[in-house]
Amino acid sequence: MRVKEMNESLRPREKMKINGISSMSDEELMQIILKTGIKEEGVEILSKRVIDYINENDYKDLCVEELMKIKGIGMAKATSILAGIEIGRRLSLRKAMDSFSLNDPDSVAEIFCNEIGSCDVENFYALLLDTKNRIISKELISKGTINQSIVHPREVFKSAIKKGANSIILVHNHPSGSLIPSNADIEVTKRLDKVGDLVGIQVLDHIIVSSNDSLSMRKGMYF
């Protein structure tokens, strides 16, 4: 059955208007994004195939070319899907940053777990804070295995000094999923902590994240 053949109250747009967005299934939301199906199948079947494809793949790695491999998805539909995903990601990140609390390492993890927790390479970030411990910005410092040649104090503190940060929190992911700090993690953290003392920008913590968990190196007394 095609959308136009449905009872009006069951059509995705009308259902959203009557019952609210929380009443919508993933497939129904995708129907609104896609708008139309293809000659061989209606938008409801196409939407289910798209949702199944996204669930089977890491949505963070999706691109226009990848989505266009799905039968019935051209450039217009692919870009609409990615735009919807990106808006959701940005709003989620903004909410996590707004709810950040210095006393809660989990609030740092909430910012980064979805973004880098499942990445297959290490991403090293500095979270810059002002004198009231509010987030100024998050800065990507490096990608690749953490060591002292890649994570240089100059790169870590350059943005912090330029943006007037009072303190920083270091964050990086472990592609293996293990949260145990490596010797390189500990050495780099201790070095950056000392440099922070010298330049007057305190390193408050170093958080290691996976896709669904985190570890505070400060609480673990690794530095």
UniProtKB/Swiss-Prot annotation:
GO terms for biological process: proteolysis. A motif (JAMM motif) lies at residues 172-185. Coiled coil: none annotated. This is UPF0758 protein FMG_0357. The keyword Hydrolase applies. CDD domains: MPN_DUF2466. Keywords: Hydrolase, Metal-binding, Metalloprotease, Protease, Zinc. InterPro entries: MPN, RadC_JAB, UPF0758, UPF0758_CS, UPF0758_N. It comes from Finegoldia magna (strain ATCC 29328 / DSM 20472 / WAL 2508) (Peptostreptococcus magnus). The keyword Transmembrane helix does not apply. Zn(2+) binds at residues 172, 174, 185. Belongs to the UPF0758 family. GO terms for molecular function: metal ion binding; metallopeptidase activity. It comes from the Bacteria. Residues 101-223 form the MPN domain. It holds the Pfam family RadC.
